[in-house]
């Protein structure tokens, strides 16, 4: 049963799943993901894993020095990429980055250079400190400066400098905040999200240029934080892994990817809504990715429609 539900599908098989049985298939996979406790679990190890399940947390955040602002506790876990170990750090249950000394300590000690933030609230009304006209602030031994803000229609890019007062050193960090909340219904939203993923990866690669090719661990992990919906951070990582799997193997298995992430994080339950969004974005990826298929004519037509749509509504094109 495990092999059947978690086996890889070729990209053509996956993209042809849009049929009368599509929702039934997705619901079955979703139940399987939520009721499987361990990645690559077998009936023989199921009982043992339930009793000895571990979490691959970055560190015990609660063991860090207490913050002057009171409680400063949250969970953070490494998540492997498709072919890169510890590519992401997923942050959970963090209420405020500004008031969290431990958050910036995590950023500093893991050598993070790219931060991705989601907020399910209306970002225009959000009181997030980076939206304000505050150019710098201090938390513990860390000084954080906003050097440049680049606003786009559906995301904001902020260049930060974080300085450590204890050793006098500083680091440049690129902070992305995604403003849209794709539901997978519109191909344009899916295309934008995929473009955003590719841009974040490019930014990380720029920081990793000097990394040794023999080192299979990310030198500068991407920190992903989602306010109000922890699952969105998980979806970001899952989509990145799935899209890389499609590029490299021309096949994909969403259940396998989520189960592996589940074994690395604090995730116990993944909503059907979020699982459906991942699958719909991947279904639309046939037009957003640069892949050679028999539908190349349709791909060209789709991209032309997207450009026209963006011109009419004065939005930035993803192509």
UniProtKB/Swiss-Prot annotation:
<dbReference type="Pfam" id="PF00102">
    <property type="entry name" value="Y_phosphatase"/>
</dbReference>
<dbReference type="InterPro" id="IPR000242">
    <property type="entry name" value="PTP_cat"/>
</dbReference>
<dbReference type="InterPro" id="IPR029021">
    <property type="entry name" value="Prot-tyrosine_phosphatase-like"/>
</dbReference>
<dbReference type="GO" id="GO:0004725">
    <property type="term" value="F:protein tyrosine phosphatase activity"/>
</dbReference>
<feature type="domain" description="Tyrosine-protein phosphatase">
    <location>
        <begin position="7"/>
        <end position="285"/>
    </location>
</feature>
<comment type="similarity">
    <text>Belongs to the protein-tyrosine phosphatase family.</text>
</comment>
<protein>
    <recommendedName>
        <fullName>Tyrosine phosphatase-like protein N3</fullName>
    </recommendedName>
</protein>
<dbReference type="InterPro" id="IPR003595">
    <property type="entry name" value="Tyr_Pase_cat"/>
</dbReference>
<dbReference type="InterPro" id="IPR050348">
    <property type="entry name" value="Protein-Tyr_Phosphatase"/>
</dbReference>
